[in-house]
């Protein structure tokens, strides 16, 4: 064993590690505060047209954070009257889930993290008409829930610009159930 327990290079390396941790930690805190202040300032739903593969509409708000022990989910409302094939339904639901996720990343990141920590639950339910789909969308927006309406491009099975899927959430399961709880599973 040597005379010294720590030589100067070990001390300098230790200080450098602690300094880099401190700087990174402070940066993360500031960045998290900035994102949270953006979402906390939103009082009304946003609405936006988007050109995700099939095209979509969206609206969101901070509603749906729930409590710490709440379950979170996303519900995909599929139009059953269009008689889409299984693959087409899967693709349209994928567009809806991705669209809703992208909007939640920007507008409700804390809620999104809660949903991710609960396993990213997604439930597919059905409606029998466009009118019923739009009524669900209107109620979800009234409840200030994140929504993403998918319109088909019309390249395969169904007519162009058909409203195929509505994604609601992610949000607290209880909040979503108030809007979609009466619908039957797909």
Swiss-Prot record:
Catalytic activity, EC: 3.1.1.29
Disulfide bridges in this chain: none
Catalytic class of the enzyme: hydrolase
Molecular function terms from GO: peptidyl-tRNA hydrolase activity
Pfam families reported for this sequence: PTH2 (PF01981)
Reactions catalysed, as given in the entry: an N-acyl-L-alpha-aminoacyl-tRNA + H2O = an N-acyl-L-amino acid + a tRNA + H(+)
GO cellular component annotations of the record: cytosol; mitochondrial outer membrane
Superkingdom of source: Eukaryota
InterPro entries the record matches: Pep_tRNA_hydro_II_dom_sf (IPR023476), PTH2 (IPR002833)
Keyword Hydrolase tagged: yes
Keywords annotated in UniProt: Hydrolase
Function: The natural substrate for this enzyme may be peptidyl-tRNAs which drop off the ribosome during protein synthesis.
Family: Belongs to the PTH2 family.
NCBIfam families named in the record: arch_pth2, PRK04322.1
Protein's UniProt name: Probable peptidyl-tRNA hydrolase 2
